[in-house]
């Protein structure tokens, strides 16, 4: 009661200031609840809270939706969540020979890379592990750059993303620390750099999965488009490291992709390439020497 009379006896201006301060604090609290509530929070927020069978792409979505702008710079934007596209450049189909990395006379595809000195020793080991995932069972070899004109520049920029296929000259792969430094995420981005799109982008995907359009966040519907890509005469790969998870870009925690054959089929991978992922690499690059 004493505090009430003290407040009552303060000047009118003091009471106004006090009320404004209280109102501001409440506004901040309500704003935070609005921005980060399951219903209105960042894309897939509720889905990630309720489902623990995550994929590499789920981690990429988490990193990019929370921290990375879809506009990387004035002329480059992100498509399908993590594919960097420059204005005026075709982005989707990369099975023309012009966007593949060159194959050596010894039958291997040597992809040169430069690693940012900003990464710690442990982070460097994780990145190399992600590259080794791709090397095992394929003819692709990642080598530190010496004099090569075409190479991948690995940088801790904002978010996890890569260009599609070889662009010629220096091209960036962004692996933000620590969010993108997971082995599966790293392998996923390098697969884009080798020329591979997301598995559910295949033109024949409707034979294998159902896209639940009403469950997808409205401004991410384009991430589920189909494209005329070369499927390399290989079966649809539910377990590809390039496949979206079942709850990718869910606005309400409900599935956005459902397998047609069985709802028990797991979509995507968390950390390793599937057997078919490796077959894709070997067929696309016409590998004859498949070292283990």
Located regions from the model:
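Polybasic, low-complexity terminal segments and linkers that are predominantly intrinsically disordered
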Residues: 2-7
């Amino acid at each position: 009661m004493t505090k009430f009379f003290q407040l009552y006896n303060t000047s009118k201006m003091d009471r106004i200031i006090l009320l404004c301060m209280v109102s501001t604090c409440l506004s901040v609290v309500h704003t935070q609840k609005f921005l980060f509530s399951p219903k209105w929070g960042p894309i897939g927020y509720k889905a990630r809270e309720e489902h623990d069978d995550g994929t590499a792409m789920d981690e990429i979505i988490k990193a990019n939706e929370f921290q990375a702008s879809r506009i990387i710079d004035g002329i480059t934007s992100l498509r399908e969540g993590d594919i960097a596209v420059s204005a005026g450049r075709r982005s989707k189909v990369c099975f023309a020979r012009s966007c593949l990395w060159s194959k050596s006379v010894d039958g291997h595809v040597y992809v040169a890379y430069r690693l940012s000195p900003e990464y710690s020793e442990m982070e460097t080991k994780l990145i190399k592990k992600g590259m080794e995932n791709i090397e095992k069972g394929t003819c692709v070899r990642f080598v530190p750059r010496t004099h090569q004109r075409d190479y991948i520049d690995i940088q801790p920029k904002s978010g996890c993303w890569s260009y599609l296929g070889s662009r010629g000259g220096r091209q960036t792969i962004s692996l933000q620390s620590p969010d993108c430094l997971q082995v599966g995420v790293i392998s996923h981005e390098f697969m884009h750099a080798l020329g591979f799109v997301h598995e559910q982008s295949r033109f024949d995907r409707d034979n294998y999965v159902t896209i639940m359009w009403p469950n997808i966040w409205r401004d991410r519907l384009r991430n589920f488009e189909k494209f005329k890509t070369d499927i390399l005469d290989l079966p649809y790969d539910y377990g590809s490291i390039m496949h979206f998870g079942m709850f990718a870009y869910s606005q309400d925690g409900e599935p956005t992709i459902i397998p047609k054959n069985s709802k028990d089929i797991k979509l995507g991978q968390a950390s390793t390439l599937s057997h078919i992922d490796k077959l894709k690499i070997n067929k696309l690059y016409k590998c004859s020497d498949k070292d283990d």
